Amino acid sequence: AVFDQSCKGVYDRSLFSKLDRVCDDCYNLYRKHYVATGCRRNCYGNLVFRQCLDDLMLVDVVDEYYVASVQMV
């Protein structure tokens, strides 16, 4: 994964990898380029990312991922 320059704040490699993995897995699920780019938009603070969490059945950790994405902004 390549670091997204739009993400501000403290760069935490493990946190970034965790968020990026959600988008990679979501892309692998749908195989649509716009899913991968949309998921990462606004430093993961978007509805596509939230939908990916739901689609990947990660709803039990949504709050954890949301807090992580806010830390990246």
From Swiss-Prot:
Keywords: Amidation, Carbohydrate metabolism, Disulfide bond, Glucose metabolism, Hormone, Neuropeptide, Secreted. Disulfide bonds join C7-C43, C23-C39, C26-C52. Produced by the medulla terminalis X-organ in the eyestalks and transported to the sinus gland where they are stored and released. Its main location: secreted. The modification Valine amide is found at V73. GO terms for biological process: circadian rhythm; glucose metabolic process; neuropeptide signaling pathway. GO terms for cellular component: extracellular region. One of its GO terms (molecular function) is neuropeptide hormone activity. It is found in: Secreted. Pfam families: Crust_neurohorm. Hormone found in the sinus gland of isopods and decapods which controls the blood sugar level. Has a secretagogue action over the amylase released from the midgut gland. May act as a stress hormone and may be involved in the control of molting and reproduction. Belongs to the arthropod CHH/MIH/GIH/VIH hormone family. This is Crustacean hyperglycemic hormone.
